[in-house]
Amino acid sequence: MTDNVQDEIKNIVDQNDVVLFMKGTKGQPQCGFSNAVVNTLSFMNVDYKDVNILESDELRQGIKDFTNWPTIPQLYIKGEFIGGCDIILDMHKSGELASVFDTKGITHD
């Protein structure tokens, strides 16, 4: 991963409270896993930045290298990598995701 892509990813994560690196956009997810996380965040009424990793091969590989996590989507809250689809869905079902949002001061339903 080039330093430019790593810096770009770090800036996005640092400058936004909640970021979802995903395939597609929140208005038009391009895979079922991204769609599931979008639906979860929408259900919780969380404001977040979506980043379409399909726009660039370098970004698509770069985000995987950035976290050393092989799959997309990837959710960040206040600069902390939280996880991918299965983790987010499990955290939502258990109430842990709401607790993380509360702890980090993120507004949600």
Language-model features, listed with the residues they occupy:
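Local sequence-structure signature of Cys/Sec-based thiol-disulfide redox active-site neighborhoods
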Residues: K10-D47
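Thiol-based oxidoreductase modules, predominantly thioredoxin-like and allied folds used
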Residues: S42-G62
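TIR-domain catalytic/interaction hotspot
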Residues: D7, R60-D65
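Flexible, polar/low-complexity N-terminal or interdomain linker segments that lie immediately upstream
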Residues: M1-K10
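Acidic beta-strand-to-loop metal/phosphate-binding motif
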Residues: F21, Q74-K78
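Non-catalytic, surface beta->alpha helical segment in thiol-disulfide oxidoreductase systems
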Residues: I77-H108
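Thiol/disulfide oxidoreductase modules built on the thioredoxin-like
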Residues: D65-T71
